């Protein structure tokens, strides 16, 4: 496919890298240096210029593009670019990142007769959803939905005291005989050797794999079984009651609005005007005007009794500092918005319990839409700074036209570093075992430790030309 990406920032660059294996990619940006850096490491075409100017879009090939993805830092530029691509070039699929709630709250704007955006990606909405899931499952590092939430991929840091820690995986069935779950991958921290950045070994587990203390374990389970499986890997934490949020922007405000009915919520916001604005719109949340890196303020507000401290400002350095301070002063758990993978790797596990990457979450939503052009895909989630992916693919065809339908999982030629974790068949959730047979229209949940194998998975699920 021919894909036109507008914006060579973090998300645009990562999207170009993720999609360049089997697509013709053109990236447009005003920054010549960013474009040169991309061309030096990827086989792509670049065009320097303003992303919403017709001349630039024409030069970039908008008339021939199958998909245009508008990922610049400006909502207005992204929307205008989609309008021009539709009006002048009839580009078939137009995807835009739109941050401002003032736009996304008015869905009636986004129609062919209005602003012709086919898919809106709203980072603020996606990040809020993600953090809400983490708070709902104390102890989880990631909670990702598949098959409309019937199956979830959960990442948990295994801790001594969990019944399965120190045991072979084959013992899982004996521990919880009435619960079916599948460990999809394990990331094991390697010896530091004086390096600042932690490195991990990737393990595709077998029955004799032993889970160790501090392993990051990703498992798949039906939604109803998540807590049972988590209890095998660590001592379950008590439900979250007290939450403190640093930053009253869109994410902090929306998260407080969702949680204040069931939790004690406080927001610390530096801007007095913004603090007044959100205080008027929240019911029981306590809104404080001040700086979250003010040790006296945190002490006064009893930071030591806070179950979860969320650093959600737009400045990741401030998020890191306030997280470090909150953790040192006794907050039970700290969640921080951190965009740069290099920052996240440095601080996670030491000063921040969970680093949430808006770029990675945005990329997941984008990949799901783009992969769906080649393959019938329900969900795609980027993991480990985009190095790994978990995806939901629908098996079409029959035994004659499909490479997967009618075959047991052990007989499916999966690419290296990939595994099938679960199958959703209608309303039933089936954990994948070696003799599980894939049927037509099954939703197959795959885990890939190496995203470069995605094209191989796409070919595996394609049906032959005789399929109608």
Regions inferred by a protein language model and the residue ranges of each:
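Cytosolic regulatory regions of ion transport systems
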Residues: 1-468
């Amino acid at each position: 496919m021919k894909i036109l990406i507008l914006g060579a920032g973090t998300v645009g660059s990562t999207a170009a890298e993720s999609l360049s294996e089997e697509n013709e990619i053109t990236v447009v940006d005003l920054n010549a240096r960013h474009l040169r850096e991309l061309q030096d490491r990827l086989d792509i075409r670049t065009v320097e210029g303003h992303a919403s100017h017709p001349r630039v879009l024409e030069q970039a090939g908008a008339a021939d593009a199958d998909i245009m993805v508008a990922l610049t830092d400006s909502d207005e530029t992204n929307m205008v670019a989609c309008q021009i691509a539709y009006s002048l070039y009839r580009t078939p699929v137009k995807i835009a990142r739109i941050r401002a709630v003032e736009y996304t709250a008015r869905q009636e704007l986004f129609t062919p007769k209005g602003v012709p955006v086919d898919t809106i990606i709203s980072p603020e909405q996606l990040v809020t959803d993600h953090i809400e899931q983490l708070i709902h499952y104390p102890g989880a590092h990631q909670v990702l939905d598949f098959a409309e939430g019937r199956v979830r991929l959960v990442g948990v840091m295994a801790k001594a005291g969990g019944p399965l820690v120190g045991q072979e995986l084959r013992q899982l069935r004996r521990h919880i005989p009435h619960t079916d779950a599948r460990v999809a991958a394990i990331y094991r921290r390697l010896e530091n050797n004086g390096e600042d950045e932690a490195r991990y070994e990737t393990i595709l587990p077998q029955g004799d794999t032993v889970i160790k203390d501090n392993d990051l374990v990703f498992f798949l389970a039906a939604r109803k079984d998540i807590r049972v499986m988590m209890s095998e890997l660590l001592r379950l934490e008590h439900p979250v009651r007290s939450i403190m949020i640093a930053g009253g922007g869109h994410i902090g405000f929306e998260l407080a609005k969702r949680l204040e009915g069931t939790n004690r919520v406080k927001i610390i916001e530096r801007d007095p005007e913004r603090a007044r604005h959100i205080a008027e719109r929240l019911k029981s949340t306590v809104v404080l005007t001040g700086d979250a890196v003010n040790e006296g303020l945190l002490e006064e507000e009893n930071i030591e009794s806070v179950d979860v401290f969320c650093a959600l400002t737009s400045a990741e350095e401030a998020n890191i500092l306030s997280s470090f301070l909150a953790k040192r002063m006794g907050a039970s758990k700290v969640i921080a918005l951190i965009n740069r993978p290099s920052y996240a790797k440095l601080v996670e596990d030491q000063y921040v319990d969970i680093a949430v990457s808006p770029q990675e979450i945005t990329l997941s939503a984008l990949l799901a839409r783009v992969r769906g052009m080649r393959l019938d895909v329900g969900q795609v989630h980027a993991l480990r700074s985009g190095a790994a992916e978990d995806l939901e693919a629908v098996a079409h065809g029959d035994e004659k036209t499909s490479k997967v339908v009618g075959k047991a999982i052990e007989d499916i030629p999966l690419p290296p570093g990939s595994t099938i974790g679960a199958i959703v068949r209608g309303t039933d959730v089936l954990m994948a075992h070696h003799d599980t047979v894939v049927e037509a229209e099954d939703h197959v949940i795959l885990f890939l430790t190496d995203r470069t194998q995605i094209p191989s998975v796409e070919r595996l699920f394609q049906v032959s030309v005789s399929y109608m």
